[in-house]
């Protein structure tokens, strides 16, 4: 090594950088206490300043510090680099040593300053770029060799970041006092891209762990060493080699365990970090004392041993101190400023590193060959310059323009490719971040729904526990009531029994805690991604703004603008997907709410049916207001108001209504179907169990208000629906007293389930004949019933004209009453062949005593057979007489009564979804067709053919029932109209109301 001449004294350069305050510090209520006054002065405010302190009343608590350069939160990475490190590159190439290190507490931005990000590179990358640019500028006269090594000091152990498989390395010192790391990997490169790739590879191997103070805290000191060897291209017997070293160090931050909340390995790492930084601080204190020969202990730490030349030896050193402006970090900021202020007094002696190489005689031949190669290179260069001069003399303006255009197009194409790559990289990064945000949002929504579900479980348990506690207190109060004081004192120890939580509640609470922790993690990840996205978007916008300045061709501008538009469309597509995902989650939550409300509505239907059954079973008096509410309830069920919204909302989900229970043969005996066709044989529900199960489990179809029969609480049997829609043909309009009853369109035959067997019912010839015969007599019986209602109104006073049951209007020969209670059945249609043939004065007597008919089902079956035989004989005689005496003006085709088109029948008995049957004490007649009666308004003074025919039929078929009244209709009485409203649920006296107008 040759002496590089006299050494020059160099003062250590100290810069200060104040990072911006973060959201965590603002959330803690911190204020800004560090301020940059000018380019060199920084003021630190004391947040604990007390105006009431008498001893320090006139003393300022502010501390001001002067540095070589100061930066606040507005300074960019390029500004920090230009004022601190850029001036060291020329000295490194010339053979001088240089050192740049970042110092400060944890979480203050040291790694950001040294390493930076992809779109805001730090000092590492900027220094290496400028270093290779300087090498290229002087490569014509000088030869260069660049070596790079990258290491970290982790827990006082040195590890190679470029080759981690080497393990921990030793620190050695040679005879000349130069510190060397034994076995470190030195990579030789002359390309900036290669050295960048090596740098990124080493950064991925560096130890980083999150702490409470910093989520990406560096747990080691990283040291990047770049060695540059420079020698002349002109060979000689002796040659001079200049060796310059550049150290760039990212120190780990000093930390307090109370702030970082470290435990275990993290605390051990923090102890080693603080130990090495303390040794560095002691070295700074010893070196900063002027005029003292105090011993500087570099051997306390491996960090100070590596920085020996940088601090007190042959090096130009720059120290960049970092502090936080928050008041919560006042102590750490003050200590950092104190050490940085002392470091200004450190001076180093800088000299150039020169190596004199003397070649042996055996190497002379190689020197001669190298000199010849250099001569050839220089001649070739001279020839190229001569050709350029000749071309320039002979060329005209056109050739010059063509050459300029060629160079400009080549440069423009290269510039465009670079911009294109940068734009595409920025766009892809934005898309990746957006997709990650969308995935995090989706996961967060799913966790919220899962948390809500578990909260419902715990809330239900809390309500149940409160109910049990209240019940226990009531029972305890009843037990202790009446006891003497001694017994009460003995019972005070057992105040309330402990309720053990079910396993599902315990699991729900544990799951809620886990989900809340996961949600907090997702929230933090979302904040980080949003911050990254803002930075990337800002970088992309700057590139888009630079397009018009850096590109001159219109075609290239158009291509890049189209590229930007494509990216904008991709971003909009991603945003639409995100919005669709959010809406899907909202719809899922609403479906869950609708399902819960549907379950609640089903429970309310069950309660209503049970209450109504209890009222009818015990013959309780129903208030008028409650009866109106029942009518409104059943009307809404008929019209589908309550069910239509639920069907629309739950058409793609499973039905939450209670299932219809499976009935055995005995249960069918006790609760026959609401339609008379279903009572024909016992246990008819068990004929096709597959059909019944599918009928229960499948969801109802979406129908109109008039056709939605399956959505109602009560519904007709499949047999009755088939007979009503298939066998009965709509007759022509019937003129009654000038009032035309409009034709009622039959309901559409809709098969609700794919395995339904309703369409397979085949009627025999005898059944069709019986149906036709029974339907033809309905009009006559209806007219006869209305005439007797009018006669009853004439004879009875107003107060006795109470609501009459439709089922009380049955003839004595059709119904046999005994003291035995018949099996309860569901609600009947208001208009049937049985309840249309009675007189108006009949009232059904309900006997509470007697044996239960459920014990003797055979007796009930025999009674029905006898009744069926009587009905057949009576209908045959009635049909013969009716054909002889009826008027031709009232011609019925035998297809049944017509109904108004706009009439919605409320008089049909329906099967319940929530409650299987509503009990009734009325006996059903076998094998009859039941049709609802529309409201018919008839004047009492009209003696039409209908009433005459009814009177003739009355004379032939007298009844012996008590309460039937026979009286001629007066023809000179003023007209008076009666409206008979038959309710579908009206199986008792108070369900049919006769209103006079």
Swiss-Prot record:
Function per UniProt: Plus end-directed microtubule-dependent motor protein that regulates the length of motile cilia by mediating depolymerization of microtubules at ciliary tips.
Basic and acidic residues composition bias: residue spans: 468-491, 792-802, 869-880
GO MF assignments: ATP binding; microtubule binding; plus-end-directed microtubule motor activity
Similarity annotation: Belongs to the TRAFAC class myosin-kinesin ATPase superfamily. Kinesin family.
SUPFAM superfamilies documented for this protein: P-loop containing nucleoside triphosphate hydrolases
Region span, Disordered: 468-503, 662-690, 792-811, 848-890
Keyword Cell division attached: no
Gene Ontology process terms (BP): axonemal microtubule depolymerization; microtubule-based movement; plus-end specific microtubule depolymerization
Protein's recorded name: Kinesin-like protein KIF19
Residue sites binding ATP per the record: 104-111
Domain Kinesin motor: 11-346
A GO CC term assigned to this protein in UniProt: microtubule
Places the protein is found: Cytoplasm, Cytoskeleton; Cell projection, Cilium
Residue ranges that the Swiss-Prot or TrEMBL entry lists as coiled coil: 360-437, 508-577, 861-889
Keyword Repeat: no
Pfam families, per the entry: Kinesin (PF00225)
Organism: Xenopus laevis
Keywords: ATP-binding, Cell projection, Cilium, Coiled coil, Cytoplasm, Cytoskeleton, Microtubule, Motor protein, Nucleotide-binding
UniProt xrefs under Gene3D superfamilies: Kinesin motor domain (3.40.850.10)
